């Protein structure tokens, strides 16, 4: 199969079956495509869609986003995870204001310098919004190329990545680049999936080596799963009437700049903090069941300790970034999923 035929098969499939109704494709702008591409890093389309809609509803353009605080962005990002992406959006919009007069840059060399934007993301933004000729190489594309050409190796290997970039640059058409890029990503997401691919629906089936070998599972090779470590965290859930004490996490890497309950990695530290703040635990009080929260590299066993205060106590002296979170009011702050989960119990 020639390079032209490969790209034409992708384009033909996309025009008939492609996902053209994705929210960032309606009234398409550089800004919307940028937000969507950042959200889609480490997140599926299905999960990203409601977050994208809420984000654009609140910040429809660069100008409105520029008026925001980091807490505003983190609030809309709450629950989506990988919060560094939200910080990168905040940093990027400030750079765009200072260096590009609030106009989204259209040069590849300018884009790739912005926080959170690498070679593939820059190519996706420019090709999907302006139809510029820039190939992309994200997870779906890598998997398709390795299966189609029978490339054995790990996607993280430098030599494999170099080979894949070489191939995708040859295959990507100069015209209709945006449609091709979206098409090949759609095929990877809908058909050439990591598990149980729907090969009979794939436009590339005739020359696909993985299909001929009936052995798609080895393309790409998978590294042995590392043993997932388990860590513990004691959450002190301080409640006064309908309010909860939460503190901005400015030091720890996990959930940085999000608001959390006071939390500690040992029971001893938890008890010491309670004593220091003269807080007694009433064993008769309602208990919150412990639960697990998964990260990419470890699992966190969260043990909530509920403290019902009979009188208002101000903790501002110990933590200037703390607030009383009222369930009846709205707060434009970022909350990690476990904190949201605990608060939901009391709503």
Swiss-Prot record:
Keywords (alphabetical) are: 4Fe-4S, DNA damage, DNA repair, Glycosidase, Hydrolase, Iron, Iron-sulfur, Metal-binding
- Record's keyword annotation contains Cell division: no
SMART domains assigned = ENDO3c (SM00478), FES (SM00525)
Q: EC? A: 3.2.2.31
Can you tell me which residues bind [4Fe-4S] cluster? Answer: 192, 199, 202, 208
What does the record say about how the cofactor binds?
Binds 1 [4Fe-4S] cluster. The cluster does not appear to play a role in catalysis, but is probably involved in the proper positioning of the enzyme along the DNA strand.
Q: What cofactor is this protein dependent on?
A: [4Fe-4S] cluster
What does the entry give for GO biological process? base-excision repair; mismatch repair
Q: Read off the Pfam families from this record.
A: HHH, HhH-GPD, NUDIX_4
Per its record, the protein catalyses: Hydrolyzes free adenine bases from 7,8-dihydro-8-oxoguanine:adenine mismatched double-stranded DNA, leaving an apurinic site
The record's section on InterPro entries has: A/G_AdeGlyc_MutY, DNA_glycosylase, Endonuclease-III-like_CS2, Endonuclease3_FeS-loop_motif, Endouclease-III_FeS-bd_BS, HhH-GPD_domain, HhH_base_excis_C, HhH_motif
Q: Which EC main class describes this enzyme?
A: hydrolase
> What are the recorded GO MF terms, alphabetically?
4 iron, 4 sulfur cluster binding; 8-oxo-7,8-dihydroguanine DNA N-glycosylase activity; adenine/guanine mispair binding; metal ion binding; oxidized purine DNA binding; purine-specific mismatch base pair DNA N-glycosylase activity
Q: Which residues form the active site?
A: 37 (proton donor/acceptor)
Q: Where is this site: Transition state stabilizer?
A: 138
Task: Please explain the role this protein plays, according to its UniProt record.
Answer: Adenine glycosylase active on G-A mispairs. MutY also corrects error-prone DNA synthesis past GO lesions which are due to the oxidatively damaged form of guanine: 7,8-dihydro-8-oxoguanine (8-oxo-dGTP).
Question: Can you tell me which family this protein belongs to?
Answer: Belongs to the Nth/MutY family.
Summarize the subunit comment: Monomer.
> What is the protein name for this chain?
Adenine DNA glycosylase
Q: What is the lineage of its organism?
A: Bacteria, Pseudomonadati, Pseudomonadota, Gammaproteobacteria, Enterobacterales
What is the gene called? mutY
